[in-house]
From Swiss-Prot:
Its main location: membrane. InterPro entries: MFS, MFS_dom, MFS_trans_sf. GO terms for cellular component: cell periphery; fungal-type vacuole; membrane. Belongs to the major facilitator superfamily. Allantoate permease family. This is Uncharacterized transporter YIL166C. Keywords: Membrane, Transmembrane, Transmembrane helix, Transport. Residues 100-119, 169-176, 230-241, 348-359, 409-416, 504-542 are cytoplasmic. GO terms for molecular function: organic acid transmembrane transporter activity; organic anion transmembrane transporter activity; sulfate transmembrane transporter activity; sulfur compound transmembrane transporter activity; transmembrane transporter activity. The keyword Disulfide bond does not apply. It comes from Saccharomyces cerevisiae (strain ATCC 204508 / S288c).
Amino acid sequence: MSVQKEEYDIVEKAQLSVSAESLTSDSESISHNPFDDFHKAERWRKVYESSGYEGLSKFDPEFTWTKDEEKKLVRKMDLKIFLWVFIMFAFLDLIRKNIARAVSDNFIVDLKMNTNDYNLGQTVYLVIFLASELPGNLLSKRFGPERVIPVQIVLWSVICITQAGLKNRGQFIATRCLLGMVQGGFIPDNILYLSYYYTGAELTFRLSFFWCAIPLFQILGSLLASGIIEMRGIHNLAGWQYLFIIEGFLSLSVGVASFYLMRRGPTQTGESAFHKGKSLFTEYEEKIMVNRILRDDPSKGDMSNRQPVTFKEILYTLTEFDLWPLFIQGITAFISLQTVGSYLSLILKSLNYSTFLSNILAIPGQALLLINLPLAALLSRKLKEKSLCVGIANVWVLPFIVSLVALPTDTNPWIKYILLTGILGLPYTHSILAGWVSEISNSVRSRTVGTALYNMSAQVGAIIASNMYRNDDKPYYTRGNKILLGFTCFNICMAVATKFYYISRNKYKDRKWNSMTKEEQINYLDTTKDKGMKRLDYRFIH
């Protein structure tokens, strides 16, 4: 075997390790080029050819561009790609959370239900949402997010509007089931869609703004609801009925526009679901997009954006046990936030606040969340630290939960409100976890399935949260708060344990790799059937 070949493979190993262990800056792809070696570039070219990768014609290992050109391009992508994804996600959250505002207007009483019936409806929604996550994501991978996502938005908007006609418990549960079915898969669809355009570090940071839509539109939703609900009595309709109708039609307009505004991919930005037109980017910009993405993660070209994921590949991803610590945190990390967020209006009503105040008083907590969410992501990015930054959320929540448990039931309602607001305003690190899963997946297949499985784990947490406060525990939910305290302590320990787990996995791989001779290392790189994060030359970021 030639010296050149040996040098190439050893360099490849080093480059893969470096790329896996560090969070790159937005412009690092300019200086870091894993395709500098001709043999490695040709190996990857063959991978891209066999996969039918749509960006192959733009792949150029020798292509160069300036930092200013890349920064300008990223800003343009933010405006033309990310902004609309943000808007679509905002309306997902507006529609799926408007039920929490509807209950402040006697929704439960009007349908002759109780808290447990409401819990059941929320649980059904979340279970169906969870079950639809992976199928929805696989449909998007097969037919394209620019087609599937707009259809989802239109369907959930129609269902939202029909909720204005609800009369009883059975109809309520049926519409929650339908809503969960059409909304499932939307979030991992969009994460995968954004991964076509952004590097790993860029994606994680932008996902923090992606999830800023939650507090931002909860604030807007609360303001909107406080006004709409005052329409109760007009044409003999309840305020919550007007809420579903108005917000449903607003969402419907976004769904229709999405058919025209979502694009097929970086080299196909002239193609939407309904037409082919002028590309959003120049040929030169498309070439930068393709090469910067592949240099950040060469595996992003190992599947085309229409290539389906097989059942065998799904099972393979399920055996990627190194993703499981992140899935576990996806389940438990935000149960406190999800519980308090779902029940805040009911809790405030039970504390004798008016319907109007119950909606308005939700705003400070959401505003605090809106501030803390990007700050947590920025801290993670600056420190190049994921595990411990994820743990910050529950360190923040701990004193508020302890106080809720310790204070007597006759404590001033305003003090309880402040504690609940503190929980709602936690540094929401969901974006760090979601981006982390995408970043360490190390293949399009694992990324497609892994992001869906992570979001499914988050829905399991939401199911737990929707049943945390029970009818026999109100109005103070003392038992529920004690359970939340237990979850909070577990989450802090889990964040630290995850870091040590990945450190130990990297040390194990180092020992295995360093025990090989150079010839054995070269042979491994040429012949191994290990994929993704199971490869010995792959290192975990933590």
